[in-house]
From Swiss-Prot:
<comment type="similarity">
    <text>Belongs to the PPR family. PCMP-H subfamily.</text>
</comment>
<dbReference type="GO" id="GO:0009451">
    <property type="term" value="P:RNA modification"/>
</dbReference>
<feature type="region of interest" description="Type E motif">
    <location>
        <begin position="542"/>
        <end position="617"/>
    </location>
</feature>
<feature type="repeat" description="PPR 3">
    <location>
        <begin position="102"/>
        <end position="132"/>
    </location>
</feature>
<feature type="region of interest" description="Type E(+) motif">
    <location>
        <begin position="618"/>
        <end position="648"/>
    </location>
</feature>
<dbReference type="Pfam" id="PF01535">
    <property type="entry name" value="PPR"/>
</dbReference>
<feature type="repeat" description="PPR 7">
    <location>
        <begin position="234"/>
        <end position="268"/>
    </location>
</feature>
<feature type="repeat" description="PPR 11">
    <location>
        <begin position="370"/>
        <end position="404"/>
    </location>
</feature>
<dbReference type="GO" id="GO:0003723">
    <property type="term" value="F:RNA binding"/>
</dbReference>
<feature type="repeat" description="PPR 9">
    <location>
        <begin position="304"/>
        <end position="334"/>
    </location>
</feature>
<protein>
    <recommendedName>
        <fullName>Putative pentatricopeptide repeat-containing protein At1g68930</fullName>
    </recommendedName>
</protein>
<feature type="repeat" description="PPR 10">
    <location>
        <begin position="335"/>
        <end position="369"/>
    </location>
</feature>
<feature type="repeat" description="PPR 14">
    <location>
        <begin position="471"/>
        <end position="506"/>
    </location>
</feature>
<dbReference type="Pfam" id="PF20431">
    <property type="entry name" value="E_motif"/>
</dbReference>
<dbReference type="InterPro" id="IPR032867">
    <property type="entry name" value="DYW_dom"/>
</dbReference>
<feature type="repeat" description="PPR 6">
    <location>
        <begin position="204"/>
        <end position="233"/>
    </location>
</feature>
<dbReference type="InterPro" id="IPR011990">
    <property type="entry name" value="TPR-like_helical_dom_sf"/>
</dbReference>
Amino acid sequence: MASNYYSVQIKQCIGLGARNQSRYVKMIHGNIIRALPYPETFLYNNIVHAYALMKSSTYARRVFDRIPQPNLFSWNNLLLAYSKAGLISEMESTFEKLPDRDGVTWNVLIEGYSLSGLVGAAVKAYNTMMRDFSANLTRVTLMTMLKLSSSNGHVSLGKQIHGQVIKLGFESYLLVGSPLLYMYANVGCISDAKKVFYGLDDRNTVMYNSLMGGLLACGMIEDALQLFRGMEKDSVSWAAMIKGLAQNGLAKEAIECFREMKVQGLKMDQYPFGSVLPACGGLGAINEGKQIHACIIRTNFQDHIYVGSALIDMYCKCKCLHYAKTVFDRMKQKNVVSWTAMVVGYGQTGRAEEAVKIFLDMQRSGIDPDHYTLGQAISACANVSSLEEGSQFHGKAITSGLIHYVTVSNSLVTLYGKCGDIDDSTRLFNEMNVRDAVSWTAMVSAYAQFGRAVETIQLFDKMVQHGLKPDGVTLTGVISACSRAGLVEKGQRYFKLMTSEYGIVPSIGHYSCMIDLFSRSGRLEEAMRFINGMPFPPDAIGWTTLLSACRNKGNLEIGKWAAESLIELDPHHPAGYTLLSSIYASKGKWDSVAQLRRGMREKNVKKEPGQSWIKWKGKLHSFSADDESSPYLDQIYAKLEELNNKIIDNGYKPDTSFVHHDVEEAVKVKMLNYHSERLAIAFGLIFVPSGQPIRVGKNLRVCVDCHNATKHISSVTGREILVRDAVRFHRFKDGTCSCGDFW
């Protein structure tokens, strides 16, 4: 009797939130240990099963080991524990040890592979079962395989399973027919989905929702609306229509659909709320979002995890992070989705360090990340070039098995590329079993950032040969690589192919890349002609690019035109004043320099101060020119003095042509010596052990003199120095730079 009582208690815990479920199961388990010295096997099995569903494989194993004579249910529950936890090697080892196997055993094995994204292994296990143990085949097995086919877009596999469904006579069963319909609808095979739909003996609202979802996913809006108007609708139906409209770029119509549901007086639940909020976020419609938030509070859904997560996402997309944080802090229960919404929200609004902190807090709270959350955390590290935390997350990806997901691998390729470790980025890319268009684009962008045009173009060509269609980001990387390598004609060719071959309408960013292509090569007149032929005027980036090139080439005429155009576009943009001032200074026109400075003061235009940073032992050390705030100031300045003497002996000659002050030459030289990147490099030489590269970031373009000085520093110290400035990566080693002095 006692065993039955405790068994019921454990079963009642299943379905509670992760935190409560864990607490109550462990509490009941403790009571069992104290009250029952020899629990019955079926009670042990229920405890193992509960721990399995909680992904607590360690506890599940401990309980299993206490069972005197484990039966098949015991073994299946242990197998389930490893399956749910993603511990594939332990799952396989347990499977091999099983004294007997039934349909549940095979289903758990196949589902374990499926949950870990190991499609090939799941298919192999299924085929083995069909060949040698077909008697164990159940409708659950077929349902699992259909879900696998659907989530991974494997149409041929899905059709193979469909054939077996027909052969076994399961086609009319809802348990199989529902995932079969969903599979076809999800992969866009609408005609097949309709055949399954009309072949079912009983069609419920779930079936209608699946078919409607497939129509919406294929952009067949009118067909979906026709089905929607004639069907019996539940809240999921309304939510699916709202979500489908939003995903087809009809966010306003999605919000209107929500209003129609509300006007009809239909009962609101988590599904419509969770679908309309992303539409508000996509439009940046904060007022509508706040109104829906008020409706959520009135209907008492503010504590629902799904709704709370959607609210966080909406506020983050509307750049209202303080509202997002308020919603998050007030949530009584949080799951991986709500934590992920915060990580993504902070990461995509430029607050990457806080995003990483939120991710670490999530792990401390006992919630394991999924592949999407981990991928977003790694992306946040990439955005701030934080290789230290990113490498730790790489380790987490390996130990958790999430490395097999393409989203995680893509983020790691991007991380190492953005942190200047192009070798590790390439190695990871080559090791990927599955690559999508994002994988190739990440690698193309990494090579482009390093100015390795040949590799960039070769990789792009391979991507196209593999049948993957490049997007605007991919073409940006290719044209940028051509620009940094001075391959003007190739860059022009790829720009033309965007429209003619790939159907991509060039954005303002692509036009800026083309301005950069001409400007870097000194073909300033061609850049000017290109600008005059554009369908719209350049943005600030385009004008600044041309103006920077005019400064480097000393072209006052075109530089003045670019500066005046930039100032007209944005009177408070400092680049128009500072870059033109630099051209005047290089030509000794100090009166013109003074006039520009007066104009800046009158309009309250402030130049963005140059800042460089280096991360060491988890702490970010930032420096500005002539910085006196560092606690290591004396050591840094002494190191700079020592370096300056060594590089002068090595042939370094200061270039003061772009110093904007009318002062003595010696003063100009001294000003150059204490630029922010040199302070950061000196810090690295003092504290970063030899054998490790020194990694420095800078918010502006590295000046010509500091670039030259850093080459000499790498020569006299024998150290590898990586500098990521606003333009590209520079890898200084043995007196040379990876950019070939072209940046």
